[in-house]
Amino acid sequence: MINISDKAQNHFISLLSKEPIGTQIRVFIINPGTQNAECGVAYCTEDDVENHDIKLNYNHFFVYVDRSIISFLKNSEIDLIVDNVGSQLTFKAPYAKQNYSKNTASSLKERIENFLNNNINPQLSMHGGKVHLIQISQNNTALIKFTGGCNGCSMIGTTLKEIVEKKILSFFPEIKKVIDQTDHLHGNHSFY
């Protein structure tokens, strides 16, 4: 699925040796299946692992990937390019921008959950956060809840209005309103 060169694997092993024990690697795609798709690699602590993640085994480390983006990672490669100037990781995912997965979700709730998992949560996961759809009320209000680094973050108002709400209302015209039902408590888990 993801071919990681020996040089890149050794680079990851070196980086992970400087992180807290149990820290692994996460591969993600922001806006998968669109022309704006962007691939990325980040650290993944044990607390960041989700039930829907797939664990890939490599020499001395694991890579976690959200199950919903697997089709976009077909034939992907991560390599470490070393030259006179320095070194740089390269990540090639030829299917990242293709609308490769079929939308099989039947209900509005399933379609919004898929949308959040594929388009919003990859961005929020870079800050250790996530947004969940709790339910859709009878008056077509989407009730959502933020978890992880988003809970108690001082930027949550901007994230809610400028990213989550704007995108849900734009992609799902049947939704009239988005309400955040998170009990925001600022703490060490909060990103800002």
UniProtKB/Swiss-Prot annotation:
How does the cofactor attach, per the note? Answer: Binds 1 [4Fe-4S] cluster per subunit. The cluster is presumably bound at the interface of two monomers.
Keywords tagged on the record = 4Fe-4S, Iron, Iron-sulfur, Metal-binding
Record-listed [4Fe-4S] cluster binding positions: 150, 153
Q: Which GO terms describe its molecular function?
A: 4 iron, 4 sulfur cluster binding; iron ion binding
Q: Which SUPFAM superfamilies match?
A: Fe-S cluster assembly (FSCA) domain-like, HesB-like domain
Instruction: Indicate whether Transcription appears among the record's keywords.
Output: no
Sorted alphabetically, the Gene Ontology BP terms of this entry are: iron-sulfur cluster assembly; protein maturation
The source's domain of life comes to Bacteria
Pfam families per the UniProt record, alphabetical: Fe-S_biosyn (PF01521), NifU (PF01106)
Q: What cofactors does this protein use?
A: [4Fe-4S] cluster
Q: State whether it acts alone or in a complex, and with which partners, per the record.
A: Homodimer.
Q: What does this protein do?
A: Involved in iron-sulfur cluster biogenesis. Binds a 4Fe-4S cluster, can transfer this cluster to apoproteins, and thereby intervenes in the maturation of Fe/S proteins. Could also act as a scaffold/chaperone for damaged Fe/S proteins.
Family in the record: Belongs to the NfuA family.
Task: Quote the protein name from its UniProt record.
Answer: Fe/S biogenesis protein NfuA
Native organism: Buchnera aphidicola subsp. Schizaphis graminum (strain Sg)
Name of the coding gene: nfuA
